[in-house]
Regions:
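Acidic catalytic loop of the alpha/beta-hydrolase fold
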Residues: 295-299
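Alpha/beta-hydrolase
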Residues: 205-279, 286, 306
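Conserved HGGG/HGGXW glycine-rich cap/lid loop of the alpha/beta-hydrolase fold
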Residues: 52-135
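Conserved acidic catalytic loop of the alpha/beta-hydrolase fold
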Residues: 134-135, 139-142, 146-164
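Short beta-strand/loop motif that positions the catalytic acidic residue
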Residues: 284, 290-292
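N-terminal cap/lid segment of alpha/beta-hydrolase-fold proteins
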Residues: 30-57
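Catalytic active-site module of serine/aspartate enzymes centered on a nucleophile-bearing elbow/loop
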Residues: 314-345
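Conserved hydrolase catalytic core segment
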Residues: 162-201
Length: 345
């Protein structure tokens, strides 16, 4: 009689589960059972899809020494995680951070939110209501910033990070403030970049930069999307420091990776419907620094000063000449500020 090679259903399930788990190094096991693979975007990072519950999966990339302090990076409106410049990531890793970045819901390779029957709403009217102190509460939106903050908190838990540092940019800075306020045990220290409390009567964007929020590309073709992206970055980016070749490359990558314009619309709706987050900013206990460019016309630097005044004991750093981006020229200084703040002994 020959020995049977058959295995039962339980053994098969266990075998498949083992095969689906991959760690770049043994130390990564502490982040949970996830299928990590080489990133398609950066030679410094690994990528995995992380299930955070409620039918939401987030596309996550991480890299650096897993024994170093984790730094979770939260990006802004309509921005896939590729908006974090690769050199910026490398500098943070070299400074001693274990870097984690991800696509927010509704963008990139993360789960998309589609709710049937939502009526069309005027974002311009919502902007005006927000600016003049009128509430957009109850507006028919798919989700709000609190929901996106919940995604971030669930990601921290899904990766078994315990407590982590947060770095939030623009809308991501608003999300980070809410996470730090609602989940103080999850956030050790925080750095915010060109962000806001989203409250009424703040200095508004300059007209040219405001137009970038409501202007749409001529079509959904790759050519028009790339052209629109170049115009956008030339409008909101740092004068004299916008690398057009790099902007084109990233725009093509974003388009080919996942083009989902509804996600940007719904994320902007989330910002407008959420209104002021000052009530959260006031509750932040994590030591915080706020970085803001003096040339930012999209979120004027006075809004960053308000963030720093609203968060208890926060420190404000004005970066002369920088706008609403992370130019190569300013990265060494920015990373020095961030790492000095986060990695205190």
């Amino acid at each position: 009689m020959t020995k049977s090679n058959d295995i039962n259903d339980t053994q098969l399930s266990e075998t498949l589960a083992e095969d689906s788990i991959n760690y770049p190094a043994p130390e990564w096991q502490k982040f949970g059972e996830h299928q990590w693979r080489d990133s398609d975007l950066s030679e410094h990072l690994y990528q995995a899809m992380i299930d955070i519950g409620d039918n939401i999966e987030l596309c996550v990339e991480a890299g650096g020494n897993p024994n170093n302090p984790p730094l979770l990076m939260v990006m802004g409106l309509g921005s896939q995680m590729v908006f974090w410049p690769d050199n910026f990531i490398k500098r943070l890793i070299d400074a001693g951070c274990f870097v984690i970045r991800f696509d927010n819901r509704d963008i990139g390779l993360s789960s998309k939110v589609q709710i049937e029957g939502l009526p069309r709403i005027s974002q311009f009217k919502m902007m005006m209501r927000l600016q003049t102190g009128l509430s957009n509460k109850g507006a028919p939106v798919a989700y709000n910033l609190t929901d996106m903050a919940e995604d971030t908190a669930r990601l921290i838990k899904a990766l078994n990070l315990g407590t982590t540092h947060l770095l939030g940019a623009s809308m991501g800075g608003m999300i980070a403030q809410i996470v730090a306020a609602r989940y103080p045990s999850l956030v050790q220290r925080m750095a915010l970049m060109f962000t806001s409390t989203n409250r009424a009567f703040l200095r508004p964007p300059k007209p040219k930069q405001l137009y970038t929020l409501i202007n749409r590309p001529e079509s959904h073709s790759e050519r028009d999307i790339v052209r629109h992206s170049v115009w956008f970055m030339k409008t909101v980016g740092t004068p004299g420091h916008v690398n057009v070749r790099m902007v084109r490359e990233i725009a093509k990558l974003r388009y080919q990776r996942n083009f989902h314009p509804l996600g940007t619309v719904q994320q902007l709706n989330a910002i407008l419907a959420s209104g002021s987050i000052s009530r959260f900013s006031k509750q932040v206990k994590a030591p915080t620094i706020v970085l803001h460019g003096s040339a930012d016309g999209l979120i004027p630097p006075s809004q960053g000063r308000v963030v720093a005044k609203t968060i208890p004991n926060a420190k404000f750093h004005l970066i002369e000449g920088m706008a609403h981006d992370i130019p190569e020229y300013y990265q060494p200084y920015m990373v020095a500020l961030i790492s000095t703040h986060l990695l205190v002994s």
